[in-house]
Amino acid sequence: MGARMTRAFRNFNVEKRAEQEISKRKPSMAPKHPSTRSLLQEHLSQYPEIEEEVSRKDNKLLSLLRDVYVNSKDPVPSLPVKAIEPQQQPKEFRLPIGDQFDKNIKDIPKGKITVVEALTLLNNHKLSPETWTAEKIAQEYHLELEDVNSLLKYFVTFEVKIVPPEDRKAIQSK
């Protein structure tokens, strides 16, 4: 039903709309500069055969043009060869601790740690802060001392507290 309606609207008064479009004024050529116009008139008055040559059709050239078939392909752009620059910081690769992460993470660059390692170092620092100082952690995991201090200060692991049952007071029913 929808196609039938759109076809009716599309074909409504087609002849009149086509006639109006054809009868519209076509855009004219931009006006030439007065000096150019005078030079063209002067040149055409000196050589009148140029106007004939321009307006004449050359059948030989037209037949050659009909025989031309262009088959083009874009050229493959040549990639610029970049000089291999040495890496600024050598990477140290470690495998993460634990079996659950060995499938996802293949290597860890120097200066980075995994979540498991972060939790391990936080737990070690929490259990014995005098042995696991920020300097020792930074040296052990190849981290910046400032980052380790921020990690120890702002990152807190979960703590589960179980409230003993004797502290609870029973609610007596009325």
Curated annotation (Swiss-Prot):
Residues 15-24 have a biased composition (Basic and acidic residues). GO terms for molecular function: calmodulin binding. GO terms for biological process: defense response to virus; mitochondrial respiratory chain complex I assembly; NADH dehydrogenase complex assembly; negative regulation of apoptotic process; positive regulation of cell population proliferation. Phosphorylated on serine. Prolactin stimulate serine phosphorylation. Induction: Expression is low in quiescent cells and is induced in exponentially proliferating cultures. Expression is also induced when prolactin is added to stationary cells. Induced by dietary differentiating agents such as butyrate, vitamin D3, and retinoic acid. It comes from the Eukaryota. Residues 15-38 are annotated as: Disordered. A lipid is attached at G2 (N-myristoyl glycine). GO terms for cellular component: mitochondrial membrane; mitochondrion. Transmembrane segments: none annotated. It is a lipid-anchor. Keywords: Calmodulin-binding, Lipoprotein, Membrane, Mitochondrion, Myristate, Phosphoprotein. It is found in: Mitochondrion; Membrane. Its main location: mitochondrion. The modification Phosphoserine is found at S35. May be involved in cell proliferation and survival of hormone-dependent tumor cells. Involved in the assembly of mitochondrial NADH:ubiquinone oxidoreductase complex (complex I). Belongs to the NDUFAF4 family. Binds calmodulin. Interacts with NDUFAF3. This is NADH dehydrogenase [ubiquinone] 1 alpha subcomplex assembly factor 4. The lineage of its organism: Eukaryota, Metazoa, Chordata, Craniata, Vertebrata.
